[in-house]
Amino acid sequence: MNRMEQGMAMQSEFEKKNTSVLQKSVSATSDHIYLAIDLKSFYASVECRERGLDPLITNLVVADLSRTEKTICLAVSPALKEYGIPGRPRLFQVIQKVQEINRRRARVAPNHKLTSVSFDASELDICPNLALDYIVAAPRMRLYMEYSTQIYHIYLRYIAPEDIHVYSIDEVFIDLTHYMRIYGKTPEELARTMMEDVLYETGTTATAGIGSNLYLCKVAMDIEAKHLEPDANGMRIARLDEHSYRERLWNHRPLTDFWRVGPGYAKKLEQAGLYTMGDIARCSLGEERDPYNEEML
């Protein structure tokens, strides 16, 4: 098994172990507070850190160059994503997108000529004659596991292990319910404290969601946080409760943005006339005799 296949296998194993998390979240009481933390472009951030580079301004992809250009990039640095490159592209898509960007840069460059290259986004911003370049880093799964373990131990400084659920190599759920009183902090303040420790000690930026159950904190992180302006460290923290979820996300589309709603399931829902979470919520209120009811879900 090569390095990329090892990474895919580990991610699959994490997902198998966590299929019950969504079901457990619905039983949480309203006085609970949960936190989800996702490490931003984790593999790419680790590779930048190992090179002494800042992932927020370094253009880097994690991919196995020994394979063809159809190989999937395991990660794209935050800086490179700013140019419109998605998080899990194939390598040839990165190549094509960078070529397109450099054609545009050449059109506005002095004398319509790019005289050098740079993988530093800050240099590219101020020097129009530079061509966009990027680093291709070979996957190192053992190294990523070591960083993930180090970050887990940072969380353990603040939270007991029984209140931390490791969802994947770069994502955790934390029950914060009893810790705000212990530390005298709001959920946002406690989340930021842990995330800043992670950043300073590992060079990895994180995004977080806070909610009254596991589902809401996950959706806050996955959807709401993306629309927030990052702070100076690239961090985003969003919060949802049942009321704000209904207010902000009942009409959100596409459904595939929501946790565990894949394209196949979304298609079946749309075939039934259900296009939003609001549609689904109203459907669940239907009586057995009604055309829309909980059974059809």
Regions found by a protein language model. Give the residues of each.
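Gly/Gly-Pro- and Ser/Thr-rich, intrinsically disordered tail segments characteristic of DNA damage-repair
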Residues: M1-L297
